[in-house]
Amino acid sequence: MTSYKNILAVGAHPDDIELGCSGALMKFMEQGANVDIVIARDDNAPKPSVQRSRETTLSEYQASQEMLGIEFVFMNNPLTDDGRPILEWNNTNIEQMDRLIARRDYDLIITHSPGDHHNDHVNTYRIVNSSLRRYQGEFWLMECCPYANKNQEFVPTVFVDISDYIEDKIKLVSCYGSYFTDTLLHNIKNLAGYRGQMLNVEYAEAFELRWKTIR
């Protein structure tokens, strides 16, 4: 069994990590790993003019933080009035990510797949990928339902058995109740079941291994 000491998961928005890799993170934490979560937008909630209020947005991701026992680290990418982050692939964001990655000796970093059809996800991948010039650990791309496998095929090469964590994963995603429907929760569980069949277990999360360094 592979053992990880320090793991960094990077999502474009609060909820992305819960969707894509929270089962694996909970499993690795139980095995003793230190886990950090970085969100590419900043921590100011959207203005009240958009669909969800500040209070709702804050309470949702704070509930997820409490369940995970991890305080999210937010980057400095402000939100527009419609609630979307100004998230660009540029030197400023790459330098921010450089500093975040330098905080620990990470042996596993997880982020979005460039095949996601959400532009914020694609730019988050680009920022992380650009900051791994000297990184020598493993780099995984997560499958973030419902945004995955649209721009290019997601080809999973790593499967993590999350059978013991699937209900907690659903509870984490349910923290974002203002915009995740019961149908989406059902589909997330179905996807985990489909990936589990590939591993001959009940539920699994799938990842694409971008690279692995053996020292």
What positions do the PLM features span?
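Active-site beta-strand->loop->alpha-helix modules in alpha/beta enzyme cores, enriched
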Residues: 1-14, 18-138, 199-202, 206
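The feature marks non-catalytic terminal segments
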Residues: 2, 103, 138-215
